[in-house]
C-alpha cells in the first residue's frame, strides 16, 4: 500500500473514531435535564461547589422529602449542574399537599404582579389558585420556586390558607437569609 493511501485511511479512521466519541459524549443521558441525587448532602455539596446557588435545608418546609434531583443545563454527558429540585409531601388540616422547591439560573420573563412580600430588598411573588400555591423569588441571578399542590375539589378554610401562606413566607425568608 502506498504511503499516501495509508495516511488517507488513518485520517478516515481517526475521523470515524472522533465522530463516535463525540456522539457518545453528546447523546442524551438525561433527557429531562434532571439527574437524581443520592442524598441531600450530595445534592447540596454538588450544587454549592459547582454553582453560586445556595441550597436551603431539607427542613425548609414541614414535609417529608421524597425526591432530590440535580438540574442540568443540557441532556448530554457534558451537561453541568445549573440548579436543583427537592420534592415531597406534607399534610395540614387533613389535606395532603405535594410540594416542590426548585431553583435554576434564569432571567425574569414577562410582567410580574406586585410583590406579595419584600424581605431584605428581595421581592417575593405569590401565585395561587384552587389547588395551587406558588412563590417565586429572584436572588443573585437564580429563580427559586416553591410549589404546593392539593386536590382542586378541596376548599381550604381561612386558617389553613393563612398557615400555608405563613409557611411559604417563612420558607422564602429562610432562602433569602442564605444570601445575607
Task: Show the residue positions of the predicted features.
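N-terminal Sec-pathway targeting helices
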Residues: 1-17
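Substrate-binding/catalytic groove segments of enzymes
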Residues: 31-34, 145-147
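A short, solvent-exposed beta-edge/loop patch
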Residues: 106-180
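Membrane-interface motif at the C-terminal end of an N-terminal transmembrane signal
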Residues: 18-33
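Short, flexible coil/linker elements and helix-boundary hinge sites characteristic
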Residues: 26-27, 51-52, 94, 153, ...
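Intrinsically disordered, low-complexity repeat and linker tracts
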Residues: 32-40, 178-179
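Compositionally biased, low-complexity segments enriched in small residues
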Residues: 2-3, 46-47, 160-162
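Short, solvent-exposed recognition patches
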Residues: 36-137
Amino acid at each position: 500500500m502506498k504511503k499516501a493511501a495509508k495516511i488517507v485511511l488513518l485520517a478516515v479512521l481517526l475521523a470515524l473514531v472522533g465522530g463516535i466519541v463525540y456522539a457518545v459524549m453528546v447523546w442524551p443521558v438525561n433527557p429531562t435535564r434532571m439527574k437524581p441525587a443520592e442524598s441531600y448532602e450530595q445534592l447540596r455539596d454538588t450544587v454549592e461547589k459547582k454553582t453560586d446557588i445556595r441550597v436551603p435545608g431539607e427542613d425548609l418546609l414541614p414535609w417529608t422529602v421524597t425526591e432530590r434531583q440535580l438540574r442540568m443545563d443540557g441532556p448530554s454527558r457534558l451537561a453541568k449542574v445549573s440548579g436543583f429540585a427537592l420534592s415531597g409531601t406534607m399534610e395540614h388540616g387533613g389535606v395532603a399537599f405535594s410540594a416542590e422547591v426548585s431553583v435554576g439560573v434564569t432571567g425574569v420573563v414577562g410582567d410580574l404582579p406586585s410583590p406579595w412580600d419584600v424581605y431584605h430588598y428581595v421581592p417575593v411573588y405569590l401565585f395561587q389558585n384552587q389547588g395551587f400555591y406558588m412563590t417565586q423569588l429572584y436572588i443573585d441571578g437564580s429563580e427559586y420556586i416553591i410549589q404546593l399542590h392539593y386536590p382542586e375539589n378541596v376548599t381550604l378554610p381561612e386558617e389553613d390558607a393563612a398557615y400555608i401562606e405563613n409557611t411559604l413566607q417563612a420558607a422564602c425568608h429562610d432562602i433569602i437569609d442564605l444570601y445575607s
